[in-house]
C-alpha cells in the first residue's frame, strides 16, 4: 500500500538497507569461508573427507583470531570444516546457525587429523576472496566467493563448471541501490528519514531486537574481553558514573563482546560486518530509550544511522586498514543527534567531529579486541553529538576535516582507498610473522 507514496530514490534507500543490513551469525570473514565450504559440500553426495581453502590477505587478517560460534575455537580452518560438515549454504551469513553438536565434533576431528588446509591466495587482486575445495572419495567441488561475503561467483566440480557469474558487475553496480548512493547526499538521506512512511521502514526494528539481545547476552556471560560486564561492575564500585554516556559505552561493548566471543546469537550486520551493525544500532537504542522514543521514532533514527553508515562505507573498500566501527559510529552519531534535535547541521557537525577524532584507528583483524574499538567509537560518537548540540565541531581549518561534511567524508575515504593500502600490507605482514 505504501509503495505508491515512495519515490524511486527512497525505494533505492530502502533496498540498500535491506541489502546491507542482514542477520549474521559469527564474524563475517570466517563465515564467508564457511559459506564457500557449505556450498561446495552441497554439490557432493558423499561425506566430506578433506578441505583445501584459499583466502585473500584481508580475509586471512580478519579470520585468524576470532572465535567461530559454537566451537570455542578461533580461526579459518574450523570455520571451513564446520561449514562443510554442518553448514546450510542457503542461509547466507547464518550458514552455521543449525550446525549440530555432532557436526562441531566432526569438524574438530577433521582438523585434528590434518585434513583442513587454509592458504593465502597468491597472487590475489581481490580484497575479499574465499575459495573452498572439498573432497569426498574421488569427487570434489570448489566454490569461489569474491567481492562480498556471500557473492558466489563460481561453482565447479570434478564433472565440470556448474555456475559462473556473468561478468557485468560494474554496469549493474551503477544502477543498483548501492550504486545510487554514489550520487546522493546526507541531506537527501535525512529528508527521506523524516518523511518516508513508517510501515516502509518498520523492518529496521529487527536490528534493535537482534543487537539488543546480543548486548544482554554480553552482560550476562563472560564473552570475549567482557568489557561491557567489567565496566558495569566498575559502575557498582562507584568508579564510573551511571549515566547515559556510560550506558552507551557498556551496552554497545557488551554486544560486541558476545559477538566476538562466539555467542550463538546472530547480529544484525551493516556493510557485511556484525560489529558495524552493532555500532550503528545499540547507541541509538540507548538514546531512544532515554528520550522515551516510540517505535516509529526509533525506526527513523535507526534508518538514519544505518543508511548513513552504508553511505560512508560504500566509499571504502569492503575490507581495509581503516577500522569501520568508526564509520558505523558516524552513522550512530547521526541517529542520536536526530533523536535529540533532528537538525541537519547538528548531524553534519557530529560526523565532522568524528572524522577529526577517530579516523586514524586501524583494523588489525577481527578479534575480541574489536569490542574495545567499538566502545571507543561509540563513546566518540556521543561526545561529537554533545559538542554539536552546542554548535561546536572540528572545523574545516583542522586536519582532514573540510568545510562541509560531504568533503570531509570523501577525504577520510580517500585515505583508506589509497595511502592506507600500504598500512594494510604492513599490518598483515606483522600478523603473519606472529603466526609463525
Swiss-Prot record:
<dbReference type="GO" id="GO:0080146">
    <property type="term" value="F:L-cysteine desulfhydrase activity"/>
</dbReference>
<comment type="similarity">
    <text>Belongs to the UPF0597 family.</text>
</comment>
<dbReference type="InterPro" id="IPR021144">
    <property type="entry name" value="UPF0597"/>
</dbReference>
<protein>
    <recommendedName>
        <fullName>UPF0597 protein YhaM</fullName>
    </recommendedName>
</protein>
<dbReference type="GO" id="GO:0019450">
    <property type="term" value="P:L-cysteine catabolic process to pyruvate"/>
</dbReference>
<dbReference type="Pfam" id="PF03313">
    <property type="entry name" value="SDH_alpha"/>
</dbReference>
<dbReference type="InterPro" id="IPR005130">
    <property type="entry name" value="Ser_deHydtase-like_asu"/>
</dbReference>
Amino acid at each position: 500500500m505504501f509503495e505508491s507514496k515512495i519515490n524511486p530514490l527512497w525505494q533505492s534507500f530502502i533496498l540498500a538497507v535491506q541489502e546491507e543490513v542482514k542477520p549474521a551469525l559469527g564474524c563475517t570473514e570466517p563465515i564467508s569461508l564457511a559459506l564457500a565450504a557449505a556450498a561446495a559440500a552441497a554439490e557432493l553426495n558423499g561425506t566430506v573427507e578433506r578441505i583445501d581453502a584459499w583466502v585473500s590477505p584481508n580475509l586471512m587478517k580478519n579470520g585468524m583470531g576470532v572465535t567461530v560460534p559454537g566451537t570455542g575455537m578461533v580461526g579459518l580452518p574450523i570455520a571451513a570444516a564446520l561449514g562443510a560438515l554442518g553448514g546450510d549454504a542457503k542461509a547466507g551469513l547464518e550458514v552455521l546457525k543449525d550446525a549440530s553438536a555432532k557436526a562441531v565434533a566432526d569438524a574438530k576431528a577433521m582438523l585434528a587429523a590434518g585434513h583442513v588446509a587454509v592458504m593465502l591466495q597468491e597472487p590475489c587482486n581481490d580484497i575479499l576472496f574465499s575459495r573452498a575445495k572439498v573432497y569426498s572419495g574421488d569427487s570434489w567441488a570448489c566454490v569461489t566467493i569474491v567481492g562480498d561475503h556471500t557473492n558466489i561467483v563460481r561453482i565447479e566440480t570434478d564433472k565440470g563448471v556448474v555456475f559462473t557469474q556473468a561478468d557485468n558487475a560494474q554496469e549493474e553496480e551503477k544502477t543498483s541501490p548501492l550504486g545510487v548512493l554514489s550520487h546522493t547526499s546526507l541531506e537527501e538521506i535525512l529528508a527521506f528519514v523524516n518523511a518516508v512512511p513508517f510501515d516502509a521502514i518498520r523492518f529496521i526494528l529487527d536490528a534493535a531486537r537482534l543487537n539488543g539481545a546480543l548486548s544482554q547476552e554480553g552482560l550476562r556471560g563472560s564473552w570475549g574481553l567482557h568489557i561491557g560486564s567489567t565496566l558495569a561492575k566498575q559502575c557498582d564500585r562507584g568508579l564510573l558514573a551511571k549515566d547515559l554516556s556510560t550506558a552507551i559505552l557498556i551496552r554497545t561493548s557488551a554486544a560486541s563482546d558476545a559477538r566476538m566471543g562466539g555467542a550463538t546469537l546472530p547480529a544484525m550486520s551493516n556493510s557485511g560486518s556484525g560489529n558495524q551493525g552493532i555500532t550503528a544500532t545499540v547507541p541509538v537504542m540507548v538514546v531512544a530509550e532515554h528520550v522515551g522514543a516510540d517505535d516509529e521514532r526509533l525506526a527513523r533514527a535507526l534508518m538514519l544511522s544505518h543508511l548513513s553508515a552504508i553511505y560512508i562505507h560504500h566509499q571504502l573498500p569492503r575490507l581495509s586498514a581503516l577500522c569501520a566501527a568508526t564509520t558505523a559510529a558516524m552513522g550512530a552519531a547521526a541517529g542520536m543527534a536526530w533523536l535529540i534535535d533532528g537538525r541537519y547541521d547538528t548531524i553534519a557537525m557530529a560526523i565532522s567531529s568524528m572524522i577529526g577524532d577517530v579516523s586514524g584507528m586501524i583494523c588489525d583483524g577481527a578479534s575480541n579486541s574489536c569490542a574495545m574499538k567499538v566502545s571507543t567509537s561509540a563513546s566518540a560518537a556521543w561526545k561529537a553529538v554533545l559538542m554539536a548540540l552546542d554548535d561546536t565541531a572540528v572545523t574545516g581549518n583542522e586536519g582532514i576535516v573540510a568545510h562541509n561534511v560531504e568533503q570531509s567524508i570523501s577525504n577520510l575515504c580517500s585515505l583508506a582507498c589509497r595511502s592506507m593500502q600500504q598500512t594494510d600490507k604492513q599490518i598483515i605482514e606483522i600478523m603473519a610473522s606472529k603466526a609463525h
